[in-house]
Every structure is written in C-alpha cells, then in structure tokens.
Design a protein with these regions (language model features):
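Short, conserved loop/helix-junction motifs that constitute active-site signature segments
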Residues: 2-4, 25-28, 71-73, 171-172
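Nucleotide-sugar donor-binding catalytic core of glycosyltransferases
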Residues: 47-51, 56-225, 248-249
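N-terminal pre-catalytic "stem/leader" segment of glycosyltransferase-like enzymes
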Residues: 1-5, 149-153, 177, 301, ...
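Active-site proximal beta-strand in glycosyltransferases
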Residues: 2-16, 32-35, 57, 79
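A short, gly/pro- and small-residue-rich
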Residues: 2-14, 49, 93-107, 166, ...
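Glycine-rich, charge-decorated loop segments at or immediately adjacent to ligand/cofactor-binding or catalytic sites
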Residues: 17-29
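A polyampholytic, Gly/Pro-enriched intrinsically disordered region
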Residues: 30-40, 73-81
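Catalytic binding pocket for nucleotide-activated donors in carbohydrate/polymer assembly enzymes
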Residues: 26-30, 38, 42-50, 55, ...
Length: 311
C-alpha cells in the first residue's frame, strides 16, 4: 500500500538477527529501515540496499522514573528476566551421522567460550546443511529438510540456552537468584533447583520493579545478536539497575565497562564479578547511577526519533 501510493514507511528492528524470510520488497523507495545492531545494518547494506540505517534502541526514562518499586516483593541479590531458549538442536542432532554430530559439538564448544565474536554463520555452511539434509533423506523420504539458516539458529539458540542454564545454576548455588520466565521443563527445574522460579512479569509495570529492586541484573545476550545493545540492557540501566552483561561490542562502545555497567567475557568471569559486586554495595550503586545518567544523556526516545526523522 505504501509502495503503491508513495507513502514513507519507517520500520525499526528491535530483534537481532531480524526475523526476515527474504529481502524482497525491502528496496522499495518508500521504505526507511533502521537496525539497532550495526552488524545487521552492515549485512543488508552489503546486499546493496541503500535505504537501511543504523539506530540503537532507546528507553522511556520519564515513564520508568514514575514507577513505584515494591522492594519487598521484587528485591533480591541476582535476577534474570528472559527466555532460556530451548533449542531444537538436540532433536536435529539425534538423526545426524557421527561426523556431523562431532562438527556441531565442536562449534558449540568454541562459541560457548567466545565472547564478542560469532562464528556460527561462517561455519554452518550451505554445503554442511545440504549434507545434513541428505542424511535425513537417507533415513526417511518424509524427513524434515532443514535450511542453513534454520540450522544456524538452532545452534545459536542452543549455545544461548547452555550459557543461561550454566550461569543460573552456578550462581544459584552461591547467591539468592530469582528467575522470571515462562514455563520450565522438569529437567530445567532439576538443574536450577537452587534458583527461585517466579514466572513471567509484565513488561510495563512489573519488570522495571525487578530491575530496580535487584542488586544485580543478568543479561546474557543471545549469541546470534552479533553486536547490538539489547533492549533488555537499556531497560535495566534505565531503571537505575545494575547491569551485568555478557560482552557485546556496542555495549563496550557506548558504555564504560566497570563504570556504567559491567561486562563479562566468560562464565568464570561472570561468577567472579557477581561475587565481587555483591560484596561492594557502594561501588555497585555508583555504577548503577552512572549507567542511568548515561541513558538519560544519550538513549532517550526523543533523541532517537529526532535522528529517525532526519532521514
């Protein structure tokens, strides 16, 4: 409709990677497409699209400031709000041959230990995906025919699942940890036996209270997000919460590590930093306030909309 009547159409992605089946219609001259992750912007720019732009996300600081926090209900040492990303990878691997299983296991191991870099899209090649499809086909004519993109996503979500489960399990044995998410499987409940499962929270009213009342807010970034600052990280700091996030290049670019937020580069690093900052209340509060000040200075919706309208 916008293309037909030459009406400007603006879109701003808040997910990375963007859930796009194809780039069809993206090059319409009416479109102005903004990506919050620089890596995604560069991907589509390199495809020849000239109507794509880079624009980090933002926070409604004024709204968050006016929310009354129930510290008694939401207060805790460490909290995590988010999905655990149960992946299809184990099911997909159950029908692979031994070489394919070993190849995937190696990728998972390397990506688990790699922070600030993403190898999955490079090593899950079309050739490898085709070999998996042939393997499935040899077992059944009705077998699923997984695409390279689907297989890469399965690996990325599995690595994210392993990281989040490991982080929560270890921290839960050392500190008070609250998990706000949807359902847990029976296996997950056993692994996270020392973690308090609190169910989901409302984004607008409850989640900000969790961030403000928690001493430490975890933000293990989805592995497939190659560079962007996730909205969750900005939400945490916009509430005056203390952010402990996995290393993300754009977070390190826009925020000063250990002054406005804290970034970790391994599970061991995350555990050590959680221990340290729980034992140092004043330093933790200083970092939280500095993070909030940075949000108020450069991550307001008013500023982002002005940039968007300039285009």
């Amino acid at each position: 409709m916008c293309h037909k009547h030459d009406i400007k159409y603006v879109s701003w992605f808040f997910d990375s990677p963007p859930n796009l089946v194809s780039a069809k219609c993206m090059d319409y001259p009416c479109n102005r497409i903004f990506f919050f992750a620089r890596a995604d912007y560069e991907t589509y720019r390199n495809m020849g699209l000239e109507n794509v732009y880079y624009l980090p996300l933002a926070v409604n600081v004024d709204r968050l400031r006016n929310i009354t926090v129930d510290d008694q209900k939401y207060g805790c040492e460490i909290s995590f709000v988010g999905k655990l990303y149960e992946s299809m990878l184990p099911a997909l691997m159950s029908h692979m041959d031994e070489y394919q299983k070993g190849y995937i296991d190696s990728i998972v191991k390397v990506q688990m230990e790699l922070y600030g870099g993403y190898i999955i899209d490079d090593v899950i090649t079309e050739e490898f995906a085709e070999s998996v499809r042939k393997r499935y086909k040899s077992l059944s004519d009705k077998a699923i025919q997984v695409s390279r993109k689907e297989l890469a996503w399965a690996v990325a979500s599995h690595v994210t699942h392993l990281e989040r489960m490991s982080l929560l399990s270890i921290l839960g044995k050392r500190h008070q940890v609250k998990l706000y998410t949807f359902e847990l499987s029976e296996d997950e409940k056993k692994i996270l036996g020392n973690v308090e499962f609190c169910g989901p929270v409302d984004y607008l009213k409850e989640m900000p209270q969790v961030f403000a009342a928690s001493k430490i807010n975890l933000c293990p970034v989805l592995k497939a997000n190659r560079s962007g600052i996730p909205l969750r990280a900005l939400d945490i700091m916009g509430c005056g919460g203390f952010l402990l996030s996995s290393y993300q290049s754009e977070l390190a670019e826009y925020f000063i590590d250990r002054q406005e937020c804290v970034l970790y580069e391994s599970l061991e690093d995350a555990i050590a930093k959680a221990d340290f900052y729980l034992a140092n209340d004043e330093l933790r509060k200083e970092i939280s306030q500095a993070g909030l000040a940075r949000i108020e200075e450069a991550f307001r919706y008013e500023d982002r909309i002005k940039e968007l309208l300039k285009v």
